[in-house]
From Swiss-Prot:
PANTHER family: ATP SYNTHASE DELTA CHAIN. SUPFAM superfamilies: N-terminal domain of the delta subunit of the F1F0-ATP synthase. It is found in: Cell inner membrane. The keyword Translocase does not apply. GO terms for molecular function: proton-transporting ATP synthase activity, rotational mechanism. F(1)F(0) ATP synthase produces ATP from ADP in the presence of a proton or sodium gradient. F-type ATPases consist of two structural domains, F(1) containing the extramembraneous catalytic core and F(0) containing the membrane proton channel, linked together by a central stalk and a peripheral stalk. During catalysis, ATP synthesis in the catalytic domain of F(1) is coupled via a rotary mechanism of the central stalk subunits to proton translocation. This protein is part of the stalk that links CF(0) to CF(1). It either transmits conformational changes from CF(0) to CF(1) or is implicated in proton conduction. This is ATP synthase subunit delta. It comes from Bradyrhizobium sp. (strain BTAi1 / ATCC BAA-1182). GO terms for cellular component: plasma membrane; proton-transporting ATP synthase complex. It is a peripheral membrane protein. Belongs to the ATPase delta chain family. NCBIfam families: ATP_synt_delta, PRK05758.3-2.
């Protein structure tokens, strides 16, 4: 599947494709996705972990020791943990967020889903997430996996990116539109 029409490219795409094919062969796609999503959440929450991953100052041995401690504490093991260790050993840990994003795109394609990037001002309830998924499903005709990012800078509302389409109903955008309209009028 991945060799026919890869939806990902570059270094992160190669790692994601290899990881996806391994997970698919071992019938552990969902488990690997859950572990990678857990690691991605840890990355979003911890400035120290983000610094460790992105900074070229830390050597591979230091990164590997710290990564192993994080993986043990988070309960991440198996294929997902191994690919994170390989990224570290190959000095590619800085690309982990892109690898996870590319892997999730491959999983969505494999499952016949579309993936939407959603930016919200504050976390959505499960009820609101389900309603958003249902709305996007009526538009696309496919199940939609959501990558939700919280960004208080949008003030309110949400921004949805689905493929080449973008729906921006954020309060920040509406306020900017009013601001520009007032500048033109006065």
């Amino acid at each position: 599947m991945a060799a026919e029409d890869p939806p990902v490219s570059g270094v992160s795409g190669r790692y994601a494709t290899a990881l996806f094919e391994l997970a698919r062969d071992e019938k552990s796609v969902d488990a690997v996705k859950a572990d990678l999503d857990k690691f991605n959440a840890l990355l979003d929450e911890s400035a120290d972990l983000k610094r460790l991953v992105r900074s070229p100052v830390f050597g591979a041995d230091v990164q590997l020791k710290a990564l192993n401690a994080v993986l043990d504490k988070a309960g991440i093991a198996g294929v997902a943990a191994n690919v994170l260790r390989v990224l570290t050993a190959n000095r590619r840990l800085f690309a982990v967020a892109d690898v996870i994003r590319a892997f999730n795109a491959l999983v969505a394609k494999y499952k016949g889903e579309a993936t939407a990037d959603v930016t919200v001002a504050e976390p959505l309830s499960d009820k609101n997430l389900d309603a958003l998924k249902a709305s996007l499903k009526t538009v696309t005709g496919k199940d939609v996996a959501l990558n939700v990012k919280v960004d208080p800078a949008i003030i309110g509302g949400l921004v949805v990116k689905l493929g080449s389409r973008m729906i921006d109903s954020s309060l920040r955008t509406k306020l900017n539109s009013i601001k520009h309209a007032m500048k033109e009028a006065g």
